[in-house]
Amino acid sequence: MDGFDKTMKFSIQDEKQSVHVNDVLLTVYDALQEKGYNPINQIVGYLLSGDPAYIPRHKDARNIIRKLERDELIEELVKSYLKQHREE
């Protein structure tokens, strides 16, 4: 039971990964928009469920987004949000 009380440390990879995540999100966003979907709703659906059916195959978006773990995508979104709002 003692092992359950310990805080786990989550390590972050270097900033090179951030650029890649940014490119993936923008590519997927554009593909969703071109297909007439609400990109935010679809990306959130994918991030929450892990179901790739939220992302179309258009422009290979489904394969592109699946190259990254969902936690990497969420991490980049949180970092970007906090950076933008802490500078205001």
Curated annotation (Swiss-Prot):
Coiled coil: none annotated. It comes from the Bacteria. Pfam families: IreB. Belongs to the UPF0297 family. This is UPF0297 protein Bcer98_3100.
